[in-house]
Amino acid sequence: MSLPMTETVTDPAETAPPTAERSYPRFAKPQRVAFVQSSWHRDVVAGCWESFVREIVERGIVASQVDLFEVPGSFEIPLHVQMLAKTRRYTAIVAAGLVVDDGLTGFVAQTVIQALMDVQLKTEVPVFSAVATPHSFERGSPNTEHFRQHFATKGADVAHACADTLLSLERLRGQVAAGIV
């Protein structure tokens, strides 16, 4: 008696040679993204911007279509995001900042995230958060490098979420316009 053969299906990106470029869906329309970054702890947060741009370009958005805006701190991010969303110039907005534990961390982080969600829902411009609130950040301590790495990883993650959401919304808007949904 022989057992039935099974075939393993793998993701082509996992089996592609390291030099092969990955292929992503193309956007039907040009996309423009605003990246609003806190300048507080810029040396830690900057990796988020750098990895975001690298990844978003790989996903099909031209680097010249990604604009960087710096604000003093994370608390100032939502107002800038709202003003940028109201211009209708951007198809997506990313927020990046570091909220340091000073007794108000929970209040500031919750306020910022809720405000970003409110902007997104009111304007229908997707807003992505790379605002981090570590419990143990001290400038100059050995864990500073850990947080730099975290922001670099977060930048790539938010680029993927941004591109995937823009593609999803583009399809959804097309279906709505066609009366399918």
Swiss-Prot record:
InterPro entries: LS, LS/RS, LS/RS_sf
Gene3D superfamilies assigned to the protein according to its UniProt record, in alphabetical order: Lumazine/riboflavin synthase (3.40.50.960)
Catalyzed reactions per annotation: (2S)-2-hydroxy-3-oxobutyl phosphate + 5-amino-6-(D-ribitylamino)uracil = 6,7-dimethyl-8-(1-D-ribityl)lumazine + phosphate + 2 H2O + H(+)
Signal sequence residues: none
Ligand binding (5-amino-6-(D-ribitylamino)uracil): 40, 74-76, 98-100, 129
The entry's keywords: Riboflavin biosynthesis, Transferase
EC number: 2.5.1.78
Enzyme class: transferase
GO biological process: riboflavin biosynthetic process
Function noted in UniProt: Catalyzes the formation of 6,7-dimethyl-8-ribityllumazine by condensation of 5-amino-6-(D-ribitylamino)uracil with 3,4-dihydroxy-2-butanone 4-phosphate. This is the penultimate step in the biosynthesis of riboflavin.
Assigned protein family: Belongs to the DMRL synthase family.
Protein name per UniProt: 6,7-dimethyl-8-ribityllumazine synthase 2
Gene source species: Rhodopseudomonas palustris (strain ATCC BAA-98 / CGA009)
